[in-house]
Amino acid sequence: MEEQDARVPALEPFRVEQAPPVIYYVPDFISKEEEEYLLRQVFNAPKPKWTQLSGRKLQNWGGLPHPRGMVPERLPPWLQRYVDKVSNLSLFGGLPANHVLVNQYLPGEGIMPHEDGPLYYPTVSTISLGSHTVLDFYEPRRPEDDDPTEQPRPPPRPTTSLLLEPRSLLVLRGPAYTRLLHGIAAARVDALDAASSPPNAAACPSARPGACLVRGTRVSLTIRRVPRVLRAGLLLGK
């Protein structure tokens, strides 16, 4: 997806300048009341719905993405409402989102730099609930970075970092999605640089230069589209 094709007209007022293309950041995408409602629904989910990973735990809604295709599952009404709200922004080639990954991060937890991969339409949208976080972007590793004959290289530094406040919507498209890695450092406090602010600082009331932001428990709703969908019978070879 080229940068020009990745633009979303309805979101252009929220485009993050001075950042890799194409990133949109929408503050207060949902209300405080909606945030509280969604958090109640997430934490009221049955225990078997949770999967514990190293550094976070998650819920998977809509089906399990698979290279052969995803057998779709109906989204619960409390999620479908917000999937529709995001889909109405025309992020997924005119088609609706059909998958939601719910992540819970406790203070001090994060996720290693990664790419979302080819199972998804090349756009990711994330609603943040409960607490802020800082999302870091990295250039992909080069083959020579893994050369055992070379001296060990220091950990990569982010090319840019965004502050994500509660109730915000983040959308990644184009090179920001297809080329760069993104991750969240395992930290309890985010110390903002006193000399430079995140590129989306103008939309973040808490982004004061030199501020130390203490993380709380954060829940993210990652809303995407899985293009390849199968009926159960096809997956079973029937």
Swiss-Prot record:
Enzyme class, UniProt record, top EC level: oxidoreductase
Sequence positions that bind 2-oxoglutarate: 103, 105, 218, 220
Matching InterPro entries: AlkB-like (IPR027450), AlkB-like_sf (IPR037151), ALKBH6 (IPR032862), Oxoglu/Fe-dep_dioxygenase_dom (IPR005123)
Tissue specificity of this protein: Widely expressed, with highest expression in testis and pancreas.
Cellular component terms (Gene Ontology): cytoplasm; focal adhesion; nucleoplasm; nucleus
Cofactor comment text: Binds 1 Fe(2+) ion per subunit.
Family statement drawn from the similarity comment of this UniProt entry: Belongs to the alkB family.
Protein name per the record: Probable RNA/DNA demethylase ALKBH6
Organism expressing this protein natively: Homo sapiens
